[in-house]
Amino acid sequence: MDKLLERFLHYVSLDTQSKSGVRQVPSTEGQWKLLRLLKQQLEEMGLVNITLSEKGTLMATLPANVEGDIPAIGFISHVDTSPDFSGKNVNPQIVENYRGGDIALGIGDEVLSPVMFPVLHQLLGQTLITTDGKTLLGADDKAGVAEIMTALAVLKGNPIPHGDIKVAFTPDEEVGKGAKHFDVEAFGAQWAYTVDGGGVGELEFENFNAASVNIKIVGNNVHPGTAKGVMVNALSLAARIHAEVPADEAPETTEGYEGFYHLASMKGTVDRAEMHYIIRDFDRKQFEARKRKMMEIAKKVGKGLHPDCYIELVIEDSYYNMREKVVEHPHILDIAQQAMRDCHITPEMKPIRGGTDGAQLSFMGLPCPNLFTGGYNYHGKHEFVTLEGMEKAVQVIVRIAELTAKRGQ
């Protein structure tokens, strides 16, 4: 389908891994390389109003080819890959007509197995694009990037009626910074879709409410031989804090609409310790209750400490559940579902146990649910995407554009 695979393989060859804890946006130079490449390709394709901001947001417009009061709609993907696993020297493997069983990843012992990933049973006969076991693939979200670019080429080269189509490619989504610098007014769409989901048919408009919790613990270190009544072990305090957190409300024990507390990192010595949690919940009241719970735990464990020893807790909200914004505009979901059905796809409405740029954008005035890309197992060496799934995503994007035009004519 019009260079879809070629585009995808080109994009994943560029190392665009983002980096957390960096002030600049984009956080890595590699993202600029892909953004500049996309800008050049958009220019060659004949799009207009192409801008690349100093914060690495690339925007462009495919002008309407029909008249009428047709709303401008947008499609958005991010160019960075996760910091969780290497994205350097990605070497994709193409497995045509998958016949089942294990797929060897490279020349080592790594395999992609239907025992661990049963979804493979549903993909027999399809073309799978996998890693070589040494890196992630980057389908999150270069599959989305390639799909949007291919959909633009299809719309540009065929007499398919559409209104103004706005596209944007953002940096640093994986570290939560991309959408913060997104100029919704300049984008000019009434609503948009991120193309950043998973398997074929996924349509997501609910995501976690999210917060980060940083805990600083200051103890008192003395020689252990003379420590009685004097030593305050910061690591012991950290252990007590974590013991108070509900063990059955962790990522590894929850699913669906269940929220969790997740101890993401902990480091320290007797003298000082730091803990970093993330809190997630779909329900706003439960989300607030989880934050209060963490404050109560810190207060309880810190009670009675010497004034020079203390526990300091800082909670920062990261993003909120976009459901409350998207459901105000039900036609956005109706059009996407109809587009999928028209492409012989059964829509699968499911909550995102995570977040997308669309969550932040929805609260910035741009309602923005999430469409599938055809990818699986993101952020690791078992990541893969199906060519057929990517082709379906292109078809759905094109059909959404066409259905929106019909509504406005």
UniProtKB/Swiss-Prot annotation:
GO biological process, one term: peptide catabolic process
Binding positions for Zn(2+) 1 per the UniProt entry: 78, 140, 196
Binding residue positions for Zn(2+) 2: 140, 174, 379
Broad class of enzyme this protein falls into: hydrolase
Active site positions, chain numbering: 80, 173 (proton acceptor)
Regulation of its activity: Inhibited by EDTA.
Subcellular location: Cytoplasm
Comment on bound cofactor: Binds 2 Zn(2+) ions per subunit.
Region spans: Catalytic N-terminal: 1-207
Keywords of this entry: Aminopeptidase, Cytoplasm, Hydrolase, Metal-binding, Metalloprotease, Protease, Zinc
Molecular function via GO: metallopeptidase activity; tripeptide aminopeptidase activity; zinc ion binding
Subunit field text: Homodimer.
Family: Belongs to the peptidase M20B family.
Role this protein plays: Cleaves the N-terminal amino acid of tripeptides. Hydrolyzes tripeptides containing N-terminal methionine, leucine, or phenylalanine. Displays little or no activity against dipeptides, N-blocked or C-blocked tripeptides, and tetrapeptides.
Protein name, entry field: Peptidase T
Biological source species: Salmonella typhimurium (strain LT2 / SGSC1412 / ATCC 700720)
